[in-house]
Amino acid sequence: MKKERENLELLLICMVIGIIAACITGYFLYENKKEYWEVQARDIFYEALTEEMQKRSGIEVFLCTKGNNHLPVVDFVDKKKEPITVFMETEYGKKNFVIPYEKHTHNIIRSSDQRMLYTYVLYKDSLKADSLNMIWSDLLAKVKFPGKTIVRVSVTDWWEHETNAYSNDLSYLSKSDSLVSCYLGYRCEIGVTGFTYFSWWEVLTLKDKILLGALVVASLLLFFVQEFMIR
């Protein structure tokens, strides 16, 4: 009876060791693969955004500029990180806008003229979160991306009130990580954020799952090998 109890305890210990080894290995496998897929998703996000903007290439644009409209050159080692001020005149009047340093540096366009162009184009045909997310998802599907994506589009109007729109599927939003954020427009009034969600079961490949199962089985085999050697 005592011998059977000792064997059971030893079996449980071997099983726990195997499970712990599988969990630790699985964690590092998951983190490694997640990092890889995040890089892929981030690069493809900008590709999707470019493709979405190309849909508006047929819009006729009439812009009038005067004076010095050139924005300061982005310096990523600038320790001051001071905001910049831009002036605009539209049908709503004249106004100076203060752009935070982070928004200025994360605008996808460096040219001030191109930024003004995007402001006008997206005023005429606003960015759609669903449309962008669909393009992003379709491009990611080509590389067999194992996660889920969500897009948020934030727009700050002339009176500096911000509104947010999300792509349809929000079931994973609370579990998702903010992967990439960028801005468009002369005053960086349009913010686009891409979210990703990864289930560990989907991220790990069949080979990874077999490896984790093998670790548990191997720990149990140690118990039976020991029993065999004793006998």
What do the predicted segments below correspond to?
Residues I20-E38:
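N-terminal membrane-insertion alpha helix
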Residues N7-G26:
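Extreme N-terminal signal-anchor transmembrane helix of membrane signaling/transducer proteins, especially
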Residues G185-C188, W201, T205:
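A hydrophobic membrane-anchoring alpha-helix module
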Residues M1-K2, T25:
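Membrane-anchoring signal-anchor transmembrane alpha-helices and their immediate flanking context
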Residues E35-T196:
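The feature marks either
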Residues K2-L10, E202-R231:
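Juxtamembrane interface at the cytosolic side of transmembrane helices
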